[in-house]
């Protein structure tokens, strides 16, 4: 029964992570990126706060870490999630998912730089293979696709790096709050900040918002932002760290397949072939590390 529940959770998380990239693309078709991200968090926050109330979880971090809670609001929610959806105005959702699948590699680099962790030989090999393969994919796609631009790629890579740095800071500060506490209040505050910022600077025309874009934003917030978090947290509790981390190898394939099926757009054959060494590199990084790629302070990465 435990294996069945792990398998179901793994599939749910993979599908959630894989579909969110397509949802972000649909959302920004008619809604400006910053305002769309604010809407996303505003949809998610009430559910998270209700769950916190039902489970009797505090909304505030422990004394001494409350300033860090605000840092998480800005540098975990506001900036990187805005960069993700902004990136998708220049990059197709499949390529965006492939870039974000390199989170384990970014976490390894950040851990070495900020936590003084020593990288194993296999980790270095995996990192080298993954970065080389990703570079090849990015060069191939920017040369062959009119939908892939360095402006979007830079935004997405920046989001990955910021999330990786926040992960290391959570670990360094021994941030052990529950997944609900970590997400609820920062999500609400981020929603308010981004909605206000988007309203004043992007000047969104609500009358032009399509039903598909609104539903996609609702999906990102209410489903991926709540259900996805809880499923990934449950997966981490039931499976070992390595098993849970394998989601990073699966969700990009789902994103690429969905975009091809719905939009008829597929990455080039060369890029598809380069996914093989990319997956191998990420796999080696995960195997060698044999530690959670995410922690309780990183569960919200399932909102991508």
Swiss-Prot record:
It comes from the Bacteria. GO terms for cellular component: plasma membrane. Residues 15-139, 161-287 form the EamA domain. The chain crosses the membrane at residues 4-24, 34-54, 67-87, 95-115, 119-139, 150-170, 180-200, 214-234, 246-266, 267-287. It is a multi-pass membrane protein. It is found in: Cell membrane. The keyword Membrane applies. This is Protein PagO. It comes from Salmonella typhimurium (strain LT2 / SGSC1412 / ATCC 700720).
């Amino acid at each position: 029964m435990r294996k069945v529940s792990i398998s179901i959770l793994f599939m749910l998380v993979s599908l959630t992570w894989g579909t969110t990239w397509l949802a972000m693309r649909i959302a920004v078709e008619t809604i400006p990126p910053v305002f769309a991200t604010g809407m996303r968090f505003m949809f998610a926050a009430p559910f998270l706060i209700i769950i916190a109330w039902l489970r009797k979880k505090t909304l505030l971090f422990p004394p001494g870490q409350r300033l860090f809670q605000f840092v998480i609001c800005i540098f975990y929610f506001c900036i990187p999630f805005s960069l993700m959806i902004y990136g998708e105005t220049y990059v197709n959702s499949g390529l965006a998912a492939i870039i974000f699948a390199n989170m384990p590699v970014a976490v390894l680099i950040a851990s070495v730089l900020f936590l003084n962790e020593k990288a194993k030989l296999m980790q270095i090999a995996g990192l080298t293979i993954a970065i080389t393969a990703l570079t090849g994919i990015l060069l191939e796609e920017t040369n062959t696709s009119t939908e892939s631009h360095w402006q979007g790629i830079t935004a997405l890579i920046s989001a990955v790096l910021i999330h990786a740095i926040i992960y290391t800071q959570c670990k360094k500060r021994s941030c052990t709050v529950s997944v609900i506490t970590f997400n609820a209040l920062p999500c609400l505050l981020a929603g308010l900040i981004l909605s206000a910022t988007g309203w004043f600077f992007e000047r969104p025309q609500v009358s032009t918002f399509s039903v598909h874009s609104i539903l996609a934003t609702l999906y990102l917030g209410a489903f991926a932002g709540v259900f996805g978090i809880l499923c990934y947290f449950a997966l981490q509790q039931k499976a070992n760290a390595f098993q849970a981390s394998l989601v990073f190898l699966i969700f990009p394939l789902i994103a690429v397949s969905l975009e091809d099926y719905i939009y008829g757009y597929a990455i080039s054959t060369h890029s598809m072939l380069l996914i093989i060494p990319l997956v191998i590199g990420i796999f080696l990084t995960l195997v060698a590390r044999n530690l959670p790629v995410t922690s309780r302070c990183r569960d919200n990465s399932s909102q991508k």
